[in-house]
């Protein structure tokens, strides 16, 4: 890679090869299944340096991937023998409290954004695990605890700076390169390297009521009875949420209420009365909200992330069957006991305000995400775990799902996810724009738009 170093000579970019200090850390990912031996890792600090790295890769026909948070379990941010552009040195955040905007560099994680915005009493819709990369979550849609009030992360994206496959650096917004901006919001991983995001921010001066609850599994019918009232709350549901499901031998619930303690405790009284074995719920600053699930989303070990959509009400019989399947799996494979399945209820009211064709993201509807993280240690179980996970998510989609038109949330799509399932009616326009902005399909590791 001497030619690459020469190509970047005079810049502040770092080039790491397998014999470089720091290389091993640079290829670590959230899942050990995605730790690949890249030929080189480039760590730029500017869009111009990103452009140089992209240009080198394309000129020498070197496979290229982009790394931000590294949470993809499909390997989208890892490369065996190719070039990784890691944005880890681009984590600056600038908040404009007067304009209520947040400008975040492409390598930021949500912790960076949450903390910077909180200084000014502001927040935006971000990831519910705060070490997730801003770039990956945003470009695939982006659900968060504030989605009920403010929509998806992409609904709050005002502008982006992107490096294209041909090295050009473009600003994209509703008024500049609007077709590219349309594509970035939902399928952006396929169009270039986004080095800067500008988000709309909202006042968030108050603390929020949030935390974790854990129950023995016999509480399942009572928990579902409460969950199935979620849509009965009317407009009030926009400021609350509950993620619930199972991990190990327990039913877990992460709850959120954007308002005073007294109102929150009234709302969640049916859950609190069930005598949870663990209760960490209290009033916390908003910037701590997206840490409450971190203990279940640690780095290390082998992982596979997948998902489905569901509608309410959820039937006790079906959910018990799903729980039985899960418990049988961890009894057969005890090392998978940290596997978690979460049903994520945040209001879709604001999400549905945006038309389906307004941007590339194509799975808006009156349904909710299910996130499923299988965790194990033995590489020999990779295919078995993925197959069992997919069977479980197919069962969820078939029995409690949202219909054939909405099969997959992009950020929860699996290794073999079909682009038609993710982008639906927006796929033809996406493929046309792909031909315009990346005709040689340089950016293809995440839901390949041009598989042929």
Curated annotation (Swiss-Prot):
Pathway annotation from the record: Secondary metabolite biosynthesis
Coiled coil: none
UniProt keywords, alphabetically: FAD, Flavoprotein, Oxidoreductase
GO MF entries: FAD binding; oxidoreductase activity
Limits of the FAD-binding PCMH-type domain: 34-204
EC number: 1.1.1.-
Domain of life assignment: Eukaryota
Cofactor: FAD
SUPFAM superfamilies with a match to the protein in the record: FAD-binding/transporter-associated domain-like, FAD-linked oxidases, C-terminal domain
Family under the similarity heading: Belongs to the oxygen-dependent FAD-linked oxidoreductase family.
Annotated function: The subsequent chain release by Dieckmann condensation (DKC) could be catalyzed by the TE domain present at the C-terminus of pyvA and/or the alpha/beta hydrolase pyvD, installing the tetramic acid moiety.
Protein name, as recorded: FAD-linked oxidoreductase pyvE
Gene responsible for this protein: pyvE
């Amino acid at each position: 890679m001497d030619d690459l170093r020469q190509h970047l000579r005079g810049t502040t970019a770092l080039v790491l090869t397998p014999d470089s200090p720091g290389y091993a850390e640079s290829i670590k990912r959230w899942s050990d299944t995605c730790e690949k031996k890249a030929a080189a890792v480039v760590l730029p600090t500017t869009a111009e340096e990103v452009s140089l790295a992209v240009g080198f890769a394309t000129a020498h026909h070197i496979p290229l991937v982009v790394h931000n948070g590294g949470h993809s379990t499909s390997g989208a941010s890892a490369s065996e023998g190719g070039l990784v552009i890691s944005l880890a040195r681009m984590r600056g955040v600038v908040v404009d409290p007067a304009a209520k905007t947040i400008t975040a560099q492409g390598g930021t994680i949500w912790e960076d954004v949450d903390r910077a915005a909180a200084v000014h009493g502001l927040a935006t819709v971000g990831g519910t695990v705060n070490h997730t990369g801003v770039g990956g979550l945003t470009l695939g849609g982006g659900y968060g605890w504030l989605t009920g009030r403010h929509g998806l992360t992409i609904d709050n994206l005002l502008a982006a700076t992107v490096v294209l496959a041909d090295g050009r650096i473009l600003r994209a917004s509703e008024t500049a390169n609007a077709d590219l901006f349309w594509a970035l919001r939902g399928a952006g991983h396929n169009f270039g390297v986004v080095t800067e995001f500008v988000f709309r921010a909202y006042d968030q001066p108050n603390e929020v009521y949030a935390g974790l609850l854990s129950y023995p599994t016999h509480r399942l019918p009572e928990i579902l009875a409460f969950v199935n009232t979620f849509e009965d709350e009317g407009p009030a549901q926009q400021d609350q949420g509950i993620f619930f499901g199972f991990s190990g031998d327990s039913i877990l619930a992460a709850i959120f209420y954007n308002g005073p303690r007294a109102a929150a405790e009234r709302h969640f009284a049916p859950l609190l009365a069930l005598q949870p074995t663990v209760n960490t719920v209290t009033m916390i600053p908003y910037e701590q909200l997206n840490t409450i699930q971190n203990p279940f989303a640690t780095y290390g070990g082998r992982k596979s992330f997948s998902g489905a959509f569901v509608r309410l009400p959820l039937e006790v019989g079906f959910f018990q069957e799903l729980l039985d399947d899960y418990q049988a799996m961890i009894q057969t494979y005890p090392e998978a006991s940290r596997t978690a399945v979460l049903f994520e209820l945040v209001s879709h009211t604001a999400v549905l305000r945006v038309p389906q064709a307004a941007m590339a993201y194509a799975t808006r509807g009156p349904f909710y995400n299910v996130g499923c993280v299988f965790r194990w240690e033995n590489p020999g179980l990779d295919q078995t775990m993925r197959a069992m996970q997919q069977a479980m998510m197919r069962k969820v989609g078939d029995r409690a799902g949202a219909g054939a038109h909405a099969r997959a949330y992009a950020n929860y799509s699996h290794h073999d996810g079909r682009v038609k399932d993710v982008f639906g009616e927006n796929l033809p326009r996406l493929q046309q724009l792909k031909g315009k902005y990346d005709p040689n399909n340089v950016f293809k590791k995440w839901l390949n738009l041009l598989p042929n």
